[in-house]
Amino acid sequence: MRRERDATQIPENPMEGIPQTAAAAAAAAAAEASEPPRKRARVDGGGGGAGEEEEDRLSDLPDCLLEDILAHLGSRQAVQTSVLSRRWRNLWRGVRVVVIDVGSFRLPGADGDPPRFRLDRIEDFADGVLSPSLHPGAARELDALRMRLDEDAVTTNFQRWIRRALWRRPATVDLYYLPRRSFSWPPAVPLTPVTAVSRLKTLRIFGLRPTVVFGADEFPALEDLHIERCSYAHGTIASPTLKRLALVSPINGCFVREQRLTAPGLTSLRLVLPYSREEGVRVITDAPLTSLVDASITIVDTDPGDPRNRRVNQFKVDFLVAISNLLGRLTSVRNLDLTGLNATALLDNKSQEFPMFPYLTTLLLNECDIGYKYHVLRSILQNAPNLEQLRLHNCKFVGKSRRKAGQTQSKEKTSKCSSSTLSSACSSLKSVEIKHPRGEPSHDLLHEFLKEIPHNQWRKRSIDEETISIELNRK
């Protein structure tokens, strides 16, 4: 009997894109599912030759279980199984995960050639999976929407696919857009109305331009927010439900200079912030983040390594001071990773001391400036009384000890920093890991550090060959 093509625009070759082994297995499974339960021989493990028989109950599996299996295949392969048998014909419609990955429609080409895609197939497939003929209330709610788009593969208004998916009230949305041109401006992405995102708990956006404010009224259930290489013009993230936030490489630092954060329930924060003499996004929070447990801050100076760029620049100074102020709001953290921070960013602008971190147990300083005769490191150890693990990766101590113009360092502070050894500054310290490339000037840090540590209290654990990596553990 000739089968009619489904209205969901199944490709002419429905098995295209499925590996032969997977296709064969799926076909066999579907064939068994479409037949009545039957007996099949099972070879006895003892090799006695007398096979036992068991029933094949694949066809008895409930739809919900098969739909969960299809959810792990991705939408394209899930749709392709619909032509295998009647048992599988409409199962994909009930799958609560929609995955649209244009990479599976890429045409073969030589290495190094620009990617080419089957644009018509992409549009037909996406329009079929997210059919406009389905009334918003008729389709099942989604557990997740995942879209991986490419600038060269999307010539149509892909926002309509997002809009249709949002009407199914997904709990997780993952949108990835890969630009191919250097000066491409991120396309806008709609995330409205509120009723469509009322269940949304996890939102990850890459390379797009969200047009809505991330606030409590707009996203009443949002807990996990990841924004990477996006242009976000509103400059405010305010959510009492937010628990995890990642703001990675925002690309609008030339006209949006501040990102205000209000999230009293935040437990995890990750920031990757490029900055230069002309642009950079400063993250500001008015109140301490008292629920924070894990924090990671990376700052990247994007100015060329030209001697002229080493001169004092007020915009850079303001950016680094903002990082220092932010650190002072994160004092409840237990695990802290810092990359690229210099003394201006690490020390408080007024007291010239590291903020007090009473609960900090694990600290990573990566490519940080720990000060003249590591006075910054001393301040860190003195103000982190419960620190247990310290990792110093590719750190350096350059420049002179910081002090305000026209002021001298107080005798109390001088005595405090110079009289204590690194070991006594933090008595709770249990392990120290120092890494840097062999032959780099930062080996002085290792020698100076070892000189101040009582050898009868610490022992070396490992030394790497390519990089000098020494782990010290308290006995």
Curated annotation (Swiss-Prot):
Gene Ontology BP annotations: DNA repair; meiotic cell cycle; protein ubiquitination
Location within or outside the cell: Nucleus; Chromosome
InterPro entries named among the record's database cross-references: F-box-like_dom_sf, F-box_AtFBL13-like, F-box_dom, F-box_SCFL_complex_component, LRR_dom_sf
Superkingdom of the organism of origin: Eukaryota
Pathway: Protein modification; protein ubiquitination
Keywords: Chromosome, DNA damage, DNA repair, Meiosis, Nucleus, Ubl conjugation pathway
Bias (Low complexity): 22-33
Phenotype upon loss of function: Plants are female fertile, but male sterile as they are not able to produce tetrads and microspores. No differences compared to the wild-type plant during the vegetative stage. Plants develop normal panicles and floral organs, except for smaller and pale-yellow anthers that fail to produce viable pollen grains. No effect on the differentiation or early mitotic division of germ cells. No meiocytes are detected in 4.5 mm and 5.0 mm long flowers, but in 3.0 mm flowers meiosis appears to initiate normally.
Transmembrane segments: none
GO CC entries: chromosome; nucleus
Gene3D superfamilies assigned: Ribonuclease Inhibitor
Keyword Nucleus set for record: yes
Segments for region (Disordered): 1-58
Keyword Nucleus: yes
Tissues expressing the protein: Highly expressed in the stem, leaf and in the anther during meiosis. Weakly expressed in roots and lemma/palea.
Primary residence: nucleus
Domain F-box positions: 55-91
Purpose: Probable component of a SCF (SKP1-CULLIN-F-box protein) E3 ubiquitin-protein ligase complex and may function through the ubiquitin-mediated protein degradation or signaling pathway. Required for male meiotic prophase I progression. Required for telomere bouquet formation, homologous chromosome pairing and for the formation of the synaptonemal complex (SC), which stabilizes initial chromosomal axial associations and promotes crossover formation.
Family to which this protein belongs: Belongs to the F-box protein family. FBX subfamily.
Subunit structure: Part of a SCF (SKP1-CUL1-F-box protein) E3 ubiquitin-protein ligase complex. Interacts (via F-box domain) directly with SKP1.
Record protein name field: MEIOTIC F-BOX protein MOF
Originating organism: Oryza sativa subsp. japonica (Rice)
